A protein has these predicted regions:
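Soluble, non-membrane globular domain cores that form compact, hydrophobic packing
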Residues: 1-168
Length: 168
C-alpha cells in the first residue's frame, strides 16, 4: 500500500522535519515499503530486510535540489543516480527533476547496499522529468543559495506567538 502525505498532513509522517520540507515548496510524498524477496510484511511494516521508498515532489527542480542539498553529506562519494546521489549506508538519497527521493533499508549489509542501489536506479528511471540542473545552480552555489534562502523565507509559516502578559 502506497501512503501519500501532503502539506496538510506531512507532520504525521515526519513531524520534526515537515516544516523544513514545506519551506521548499513541498507538494506531496509517496511512501512505499517493499518486503525482501521471499519475505512477508509483518506487524508494523516490512520484515527487517525490506526496502522503503520515499518520493518527495516539490514545485520545481530548484526546490527539490534545495532539500537534497540540505541532506547531502559532502564527505560521501557521489553516485550516478538521478542528477546527484549519495549513500549513507542505510539510505540512498537522490534528486531528479522536481523529486527528492530516499530509498532505504533497515539493515546495513553489502548485499542490501547493491539491491538498494539497483532499486534507486530503477526509481530514477521512472521519473519522466529529464532532470537538468536548474539555471540557478548552474550560475553557481552562491546564487542558488540566495534563491533558496529567499524561497524558504517566503514559504515559512509564522508560528503563533503568545500575547505578552501584562501584570501590574
Amino acid at each position: 500500500e502506497t501512503l501519500v502525505y501532503t502539506e496538510e498532513n506531512l507532520w504525521e509522517y515526519i513531524d520534526g522535519a515537515a516544516e523544513n520540507f514545506i519551506s521548499f515548496d513541498f507538494k506531496s510524498v509517496a511512501v512505499q515499503d517493499y518486503a525482501a524477496a521471499g519475505g512477508a510484511a509483518g506487524a508494523g511494516g516490512v520484515e527487517r530486510a525490506g526496502l522503503k521508498v520515499e518520493a518527495y515532489e516539490h514545485a520545481s527542480p530548484l526546490m527539490a535540489y534545495g532539500i537534497y542539498a540540505q541532506m547531502r553529506n559532502a564527505d560521501l562519494p557521489p553516485l550516478e543516480i538521478g542528477n546527484d546521489a549519495f549513500s549513507d549506508g542505510y539510505s540512498i538519497h537522490f534528486w531528479k527533476g522536481r523529486y527528492y527521493v530516499r530509498v532505504g533499508v533497515y539493515e546495513e549489509r553489502p548485499e542490501l547496499a547493491e539491491a538498494m542501489k539497483s532499486f534507486a536506479a530503477v526509481v530514477a528511471s521512472k521519473i519522466d522529468d529529464p532532470g537538468a540542473l536548474p539555471a540557478e545552480i548552474e550560475r553557481g552555489p552562491g546564487h542558488a543559495h540566495q534563491v533558496l534562502a529567499h524561497q524558504g523565507q517566503r514559504r515559512r509559516r509564522p508560528r503563533p506567538v503568545a500575547a505578552p502578559s501584562h501584570r501590574g
